[in-house]
Amino acid sequence: MYLMTCTRPDLAYPLSILARYVAPGRHRPEHMAAAKRVLRYLCSTSGLGLVLGGRRRVVLRGHADASWADDQATQQSSQGYTFSLRSGSVSWRSTRSSSVLGSSCEAEIYAGAMALQELRWLTYLLSDLGEPPRSPPVLYVDNKAMLALCREHRLEHRTKHIALRYFLARELQQRGQLRLAYVASEANTADIFTKALAPGDHQRFCTMVACFDLLDWSCDLLFSPTLPMGVSYMYPPAF
């Protein structure tokens, strides 16, 4: 749990799943097998860690994602977000929705609202440290229905119960404190916090959150203000 919280965002999703079965009587042999698989993964990636630095300008970017009703036992949804400062991830979370959600759009809105709370805290923290973001932070999502709902200025009977969630995003946009933008699912960094990925995709998303094998780099390179070749391509060119 310490690694997942501090330096290994790639562990967030599997540990969030396993944490649901820690209570006595809830875990079964398949959960123990999954835990051992995580330990084997840790042994084979012991040098993996976050690399911070890169761009000199303070740019706060966030990605939010949800996997609707993916819990077969409860039909609850997995949600996750990540925020990067300059180049590396500085905040991330993978969790499960507290209730059953009625649509994928609703799941994305709940994930976005959770991410917005963290974004506001990070903005206040940077301001207190004397490094406020010079431009509105950007939150990327991969659900166009959510973006359309946040742009509209009317309530409907189907969305009244989640109005407070997307009104926050709308208010922050009107104040110029947030910019919502669409990103394709394959480029959404938060995807690694909502579902199990194929090995190739998992490795690609580790690169996107600036999680690299630190044992392959020299000490001079690790403390360099600029990132090594390849790290600058964490974000698609369209960003």
Per-segment meaning from a language model:
Residues 1-47, 184, 192-194:
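C-terminal reverse transcriptase regions that engage the nucleic-acid substrate
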Residues 8, 38, 65, 83, ...:
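Conserved hydrophobic/aromatic pocket- or pore-lining residues that grip, position, or stack substrates
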Residues 21, 58-59, 95-239:
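RNase H-like nuclease module associated with reverse transcription
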Residues 40-66, 131-133:
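Structured nucleic-acid-interacting core domains from mobile-element enzymes and related host factors
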Residues 44-48, 69, 89-92, 121, ...:
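Conserved helix-loop functional segments at active or binding sites
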Residues 55, 86-89, 172:
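Short loop segments at secondary-structure junctions
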